[in-house]
A protein has these predicted regions:
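Active-site beta->alpha loop and helix N-cap motifs at the rims of alpha/beta catalytic domains
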Residues: 1-107, 214
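Active-site pocket-lining/capping segments in soluble small-molecule metabolic enzymes
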Residues: 70-96, 144-204, 235-248
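Catalytic cores of alpha/beta
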Residues: 35-46, 108-112, 137-140, 160-167, ...
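Conserved, mostly hydrophobic/aromatic
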Residues: 47, 116, 120, 153, ...
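Active-site glycine-rich loop that binds ribose-phosphate moieties when present
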Residues: 102-121
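Glycine-rich, proline-tolerant flexible connector loops at the mouths of alpha/beta enzymes
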Residues: 1-12, 60-70, 121-135, 141, ...
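Generic structural signal for well-ordered alpha-helices
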Residues: 12-16, 44, 75-80, 113, ...
Length: 248
């Protein structure tokens, strides 16, 4: 949970409910800049107690009205601390196929990513992207840099034009390919068709990624269960035939 009010309690309660009550494999989400070392130690002990041993360790979004803590400036700092405190935990890190918005260039970004892996990340999940070729190029550059952990592709279906505009405003590093811009323009005043086209575009991305033996798919559903179910129905046969590809 990236809850900006009570990260410690919310994270543990939510992961315990999902893992033990719903019996669904669970990954806890920890934002580095809003945590202290004591908070992390307590969370690790609680997660250990409830049987959750996977963590997505991020820097965390910056909220202008919430003061960050002082112990962890970057995700790498948090990952290193978790590995020192609880080496049996499996840590997932974030990566950015089109470059981190705060990085001066992609070379610097991949160098920092290599540090993240070296201190303890066992796999990575990407920021969302809409051009698979950019992902493949990024993946090749990671291999050249010595990053050999699995990289899961982050996919977000765009269901309406306002969602796309908000995304472009908050994630300025993400580029929309011409094919996707054409969808937004053609169905600007036809919400039902835009939703259908956005879902189809996401499914096409996943089909291509699985065909190219991607390590896994991370679906950004924005808490929309109907969207998740639609994409599951359209793609689950692919995962049955490619059991090595993970989805979460």
């Amino acid at each position: 949970s990236n809850n900006k009010f009570d990260i410690e309690e919310t994270t543990v309660r939510l992961t315990e409910f999902i893992a033990n009550d719903l019996q669904i494999p669970t990954i806890a989400h920890l934002p580095a800049v809003y945590l202290t070392k004591d908070m992390v130690s307590n969370i690790l002990q609680s997660l250990d107690r409830v049987g959750v041993h996977q963590i997505l360790a991020l820097r965390g979004d910056i909220f202008p009205d919430v003061a960050p803590k002082d112990d962890f400036t970057y995700a790498t700092d948090l990952i290193e601390y978790i590995k020192a405190e609880a080496p049996h935990f499996d840590i997932i890190g974030a990566c950015y196929p089109e470059g981190h918005p705060d990085s001066p260039n992609q070379i610097s970004d991949i160098q920092n990513l290599k540090k993240k892996v070296d201190v303890g990340c066992s796999s990575l999940v990407t920021q969302l992207f809409f051009d698979n070729e950019r992902f493949y190029d990024f993946q090749d550059k990671c291999i050249l840099a010595g990053i050999e952990v699995p990289i899961h592709a982050g996919i977000m279906p765009i269901l309406n034009r306002n969602q796309a505009l908000r995304l472009l405003k908050t994630c300025e590093n993400i580029k929309l390919p011409r094919k996707f811009r054409a969808i937004l323009d053609k169905y600007e005043h036809d919400p039902e068709s835009l939703r259908a086209a956005g879902l189809a575009y996401a499914v096409d991305q996943i089909v291509d990624l699985v065909t190219q033996d991607v390590a896994g798919i991370h679906l950004y559903t924005m808490n929309n269960a109907a969207t998740a179910y639609h994409i599951y129905k359209a793609t689950h046969a692919l995962f049955n035939h490619h059991p090595s590809v993970q989805s979460f």
